[in-house]
């Protein structure tokens, strides 16, 4: 369902005469989903880039997602916000951690994601 609806949506955008420089796509779970999406992008714009969105998922999930996503020539990076900052923000808002701790926690989580990206 996801792969066909995503592919259809991408096709409709191109058929409407819109050619994005980047696509921001929620992380897909399987290689088959990425292959379908890649085939659609190749059909319309083989040079377009894809940025992966993180769905507020646990950081541990990114290793699997990045591994599959990086098998396509379109994947250029990630835009993962809540997975990096949300837990720290909640703890700060509840008074469990202070400003320096929130910054440290966010920096550590961001570094984890960068390390996963570079070590795939």
Language-model region placement:
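Catalytic-face loop-and-helix region of soluble metabolic enzyme cores
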Residues: 26-120
């Amino acid at each position: 369902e996801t792969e066909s609806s995503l592919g259809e949506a991408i096709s409709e955008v191109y058929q409407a005469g819109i050619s994005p420089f980047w696509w921001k796509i929620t992380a897909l779970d399987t290689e088959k989903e990425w292959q379908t999406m890649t085939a659609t992008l190749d059909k319309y714009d083989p040079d377009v880039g894809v940025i992966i969105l993180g769905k507020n998922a646990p950081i541990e999930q990114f290793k699997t997602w990045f591994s599959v996503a990086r098998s396509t020539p379109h994947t250029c990076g990630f835009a993962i916000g809540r997975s990096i900052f949300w837990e720290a923000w909640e703890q700060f808002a509840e008074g469990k951690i202070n400003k320096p701790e929130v910054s440290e926690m966010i920096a550590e989580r961001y570094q984890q994601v960068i390390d996963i990206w570079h070590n795939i």
